């Protein structure tokens, strides 16, 4: 992690969704978070719309990582990690 990287923080919901993932998926997601996402959160993800403003989504295989970027603190808050078919259902307005 370089000085320019963002710190990765976890919300309680983010930790719960990580704990429910299959071990191989969880390992790949954590590696992705602390390398690619921490280095460039705007580049690897896309901003969400329609009631989900302020959140971003990044792909990791069939899973999606939902996160919030805090530029002032140079921090990424992981909100949720779920399968792509389920991730947006519970978050729609």
Language-model regions, residue ranges each:
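Solvent-exposed, flexible loop/coil residues
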Residues: 12, 52, 56-59, 91-92
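Enriched for short, Lys/Arg-rich terminal
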Residues: 1-9, 16, 20, 24-27, ...
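A short, surface-exposed loop/turn module that caps and links secondary-structure elements
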Residues: 34-58
